[in-house]
Design a protein with these regions (language model features):
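Short beta-strand scaffold segments in enzyme catalytic cores
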Residues: 22-31
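Short beta->alpha transition motifs characteristic of CBS
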Residues: 32-41
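Cys/His-rich metal-chelating microdomains
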Residues: 62, 84-87
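Conserved G/P- and acidic residue-centered "switch" motifs that form tight phosphate/ATP-binding loops
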Residues: 81
Length: 145
């Protein structure tokens, strides 16, 4: 599959607009959504329950793995924070596509005090992940501002 996919990101952006939460999804090598996750920090009383972490957890459970085989990607409607970017590396995800960035966060806290790109670069000795930044940003940034 070629990344990025407008179809996949459009679905996640639609989910965010209609369900009022940041969304992420793990994508298999054939371009299928394996599992989605959305931010549940408040409802779960869990500061690690970001959309990306929840999507990775759900996909790992579904596939019965703790590290993805080659070809899996993560799509998310917001730039992954340092924790989520680290999880992308540890999970063996080959690429990440995100829509919005902290410049358009509105009232949201800026958890990206270290950019996703810097974390992915620093962890490249463990696992190399590609990155597509600001994909379809014009379709999502109005949600935050």
């Amino acid at each position: 599959m070629r990344h990025p996919s407008r179809e996949i990101m459009s679905e996640l952006i639609h989910d965010q607009w209609t369900k009022d939460s940041i969304f992420a999804a793990v994508i298999d090598p054939d371009g299928n959504i394996v599992a989605k996750g959305h931010t549940t920090v408040g409802p779960d009383n869990d500061p690690t329950a970001h959309a990306e972490i929840n999507a990775i957890r759900n996909a790992c459970r579904k596939l019965g793995v703790s590290r993805f085989p080659d070809g899996y990607w993560l799509y998310t409607t917001f730039e992954p924070c340092p924790m989520c970017a680290s999880a992308i590396i540890w999970a063996g995800i080959d690429g990440v596509v995100y829509a919005n960035n902290p410049d358009y966060r509105g009232k949201e806290d800026n958890w990206s005090f270290i950019s996703c790109e810097k974390v992915i670069e620093a962890g490249s000795y463990l696992h190399k992940s590609e990155m597509v930044k600001d994909f379809m940003i014009d379709e999502i940034k109005a949600y935050f501002i």
